[in-house]
């Protein structure tokens, strides 16, 4: 009994000492944290680029300004609410991370010494374009905008405030403009998508088409793309112009791929026009199709169930790249190009954006099954109702061949949507999609570590990459 009491007293004494030590250590940490201010709030990557993000919407509205008040209202509609703004955030954080690469390794683009502070490191004659600001215009303004003294409604966008390069922040003027361009292109795609998908809500309020009619939403999206391409051209970099212009084409290609769920489904041979289904006009020119296409059943192709699933996933991933990952990956590549980085770093930045973009869409497809429309900011379960088979459905189809006919007819018959949802839950389609998303997340993290030196900006990118898997909207 005495020994037990002694042991208990000994344990209590050790525990007391440990508590005092723990308490002392906590006090020391708290005191140290007051002396050393952390450079980044790890749970808030926006803090590193808050200056640029805070003026993003304002600068975009200035870039897209029109002399027509209704056009201004519609094009600026989606910029009035707080969206995720993931794409410009990625470009800005990546630009800061790239600035940590020594200048001696960023010698693949010339720098304009007249645009930077007096500093020997920026005054090399062989580097005279890197810090150059985007041009305000290339062609004469009266040609670009048709300005006439007697017609004050025809005018170009408002001039942007002059931004001087901040060596401590490391984001170049052209990279900042790139972030704004990316958000313009993405927002244009949202305007068009909401028309195509007959959406009623976006970001918790009426969608552009619901608020202004389909016609206004389409025209506003077109206008945004036009303004974006003008801004792209003013970056004066042929590869950047090519990449960003191509990303716009990719968005459209992805939307057309979404008309079918697999590459072996029958081609769409009608066009919906209101309540009529019109035949597609006969082809006058033969256009070469992409390599991802495979012969259809109508051409006598015989595939096993596993082969059908494999081709369906290949089709889905390629469609996902075009619709979501192309804009992200190509903007990341452009940020690296504008930084003067080496070809190896540029390639890694592109792969980072591609893997992150596919991960982002996989999570989006999961949320369509798991999150309410109110939390998501757009209608939940929309994909199935639109006849679209996403990754959770494809995983369920692998285990449940009876889903094949439902997918082929785009879930158009009574009970198809409900049966598919039940099958997804029964066969763990959501959990399997999460595992696939984690694989792409891990690849994206590796791309960052292989291409960028350790820095607060890289840590913020890693945090952002990990947070994609836990987002709820």
From Swiss-Prot:
Which gene codes for it? COQ1
One GO CC term of this entry? mitochondrion
Protein name according to UniProt: Hexaprenyl pyrophosphate synthase, mitochondrial
Class of enzymatic activity (EC top level): transferase
This protein's membrane topology, according to the annotation, is: Peripheral membrane protein
A Pfam family recorded for this sequence = polyprenyl_synt
Co-factor binding comment:
Binds 2 Mg(2+) ions per subunit.
Q: What else is known?
A: Present with 1560 molecules/cell in log phase SD medium.
Give the E.C. number(s): 2.5.1.-
Residue positions annotated to bind an all-trans-polyprenyl diphosphate are 202, 323-324, 361, 378
What's its job? Assembly of polyisoprenoid side chains. The polyprenyl synthase of coenzyme Q biosynthesis catalyzes the formation from isopentenyl diphosphate of all trans-polyprenyl pyrophosphates generally ranging in length of between 6 and 10 isoprene units depending on the species.
Q: What are the recorded GO MF terms, alphabetically? A: heptaprenyl diphosphate synthase activity; metal ion binding; prenyltransferase activity
Record-level GO BP terms: isoprenoid biosynthetic process; ubiquinone biosynthetic process
Q: Where in the cell is it found?
A: Mitochondrion inner membrane
Binding residues annotated for isopentenyl diphosphate, in chain numbering: 84, 87, 186, 203
Where in the chain are disulfide-linked cysteines found? none
Residue sites binding Mg(2+) 2 per the record: 193, 197
Q: Which cofactor does it need?
A: Mg(2+)
Annotated binding of Mg(2+) 1, by residue = 193, 197
Q: Where does it mainly reside?
A: mitochondrion
User: Which UniProt keyword terms apply here?
Assistant: Isoprene biosynthesis, Magnesium, Membrane, Metal-binding, Mitochondrion, Mitochondrion inner membrane, Transferase, Transit peptide
């Amino acid at each position: 009994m005495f020994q037990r009491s002694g042991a208990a007293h000994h344990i209590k004494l050790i525990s007391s000492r440990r508590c005092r030590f723990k308490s002392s250590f906590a006090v020391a940490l708290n005191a140290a944290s007051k002396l050393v201010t952390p450079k980044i709030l790890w749970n808030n990557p926006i803090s590193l680029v808050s200056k640029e993000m805070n003026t993003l919407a304002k600068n975009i509205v200035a870039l897209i300004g029109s002399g027509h008040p209704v056009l201004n209202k519609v094009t600026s509609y989606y910029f009035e609410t707080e969206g995720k703004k993931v794409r410009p955030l990625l470009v800005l954080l990546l630009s800061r991370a790239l600035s940590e690469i020594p200048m001696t390794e960023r010698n693949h683009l010339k720098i304009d010494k007249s645009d930077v502070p007096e500093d020997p490191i920026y005054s090399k004659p062989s580097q005279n374009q890197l810090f150059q600001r985007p041009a305000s215009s290339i062609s004469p303004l009266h040609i670009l905008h048709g300005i006439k003294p007697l017609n004050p409604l025809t005018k170009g966008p408002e001039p942007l405030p002059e931004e001087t390069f901040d060596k401590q922040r490391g984001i170049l003027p052209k990279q900042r403009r790139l972030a704004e361009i990316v958000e313009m292109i993405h927002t244009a795609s949202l305007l068009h998508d909401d028309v195509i998908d007959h959406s009623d809500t976006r970001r918790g309020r009426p969608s552009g088409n619901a608020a202004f009619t389909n016609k206004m939403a389409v025209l506003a999206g077109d206008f945004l793309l036009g303004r974006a391409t003008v801004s792209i051209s003013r970056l004066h970099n042929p590869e950047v112009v090519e990449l960003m212009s191509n990303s716009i084409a990719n968005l459209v290609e992805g939307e057309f791929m979404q008309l079918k769920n697999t590459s072996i489904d029958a081609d769409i041979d009608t066009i919906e026009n209101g309540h009529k289904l019109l035949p597609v006009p006969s082809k006058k020119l033969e256009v070469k199709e992409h390599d991802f296409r495979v012969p259809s059943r109508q051409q006598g192709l015989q595939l096993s169930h596993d082969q059908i699933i494999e081709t369906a996933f290949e089709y889905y991933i390629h469609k996902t790249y075009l619709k979501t990952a192309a804009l992200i990956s190509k903007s990341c590549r452009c940020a690296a190009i504008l930084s003067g980085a080496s070809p190896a770093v540029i390639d890694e930045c592109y792969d980072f954006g591609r893997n992150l973009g596919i991960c982002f869409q996989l999570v989006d497809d999961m949320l369509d099954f798991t999150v309410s429309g109110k939390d998501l900011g757009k209608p939940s379960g929309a994909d199935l109702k639109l006849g679209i088979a996403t990754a959770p459905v494809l995983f369920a189809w692998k285990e449940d061949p009876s889903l094949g006919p439902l997918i082929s007819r785009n879930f158009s018959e009574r009970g198809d949507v409900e049966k598919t949802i039940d099958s997804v839950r029964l066969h763990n389609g959501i959990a399997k999609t999460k595992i696939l998303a984690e694989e792409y997340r891990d690849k994206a993290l590796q791309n960052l570590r292989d291409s960028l030196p350790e820095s607060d900006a890289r840590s913020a990118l890693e945090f952002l990459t990990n947070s994609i898997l836990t987002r709820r909207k």
